[in-house]
Amino acid sequence: TFFVRRNVTDVPNTRKLTQLFMDIIAEVKMLQGNDIVQVVHDRLQIVSAPDGIFEEKLRGPVYDENPEATRFMLCSIEAQNQTKEIYADLWARDNNKKYVWTIEHIFPEGENIPASWVQMIADGDAALAKQYRLDYVHTIGNLTITGYNQNLSNMSFDQKRDRKSKDKTKEIGYKNGLYLNKDVVNQNKWTVDKIRNRTDVLVKILMEMYNW
């Protein structure tokens, strides 16, 4: 909880961490067992970002501010809801030591917004689509994870949702069975309202997961 909140909010900031941990080590030196756990918990909670600041950051462009922490949180939500039938090693890395599962922007993040997305997100208004991109593209409600990011990219929403492997035997789009996609897979279009609503859902989950 402490490290997720700290990485998202930068509270306390990095330069204070060394002294914080040194003070905690000194305080628990003569303690044992649960007493150590309690002291560590209490000292970290005192300096941790309060709920209001944490929630505000979660509702903002969280990917733009900290993509690594965002990936960790999304993968943690997914891992908490995995079943034996649908399991994936979300922490696996490829031969280049990069994560196999990466963040996917549902509404594409690139500055050159595809025509299909201008039409869907802003009823054909290119200027409005650009503004929506600035306001919402990096918010958590517009994010999921995928092992096939390069295969989705700037595709239309329908194509991203229904994408299959080349041999047509595997769902590699939003129908891949992930918990994170359960409120995306049945949508016929992706809009700002749906991004906002999904942000509400995911923020609530994260506030509960990383609650003191």
Enumerate the language-model features and the residues they cover:
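Flexible coil/loop and intrinsically disordered segments
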Residues: T1-W212
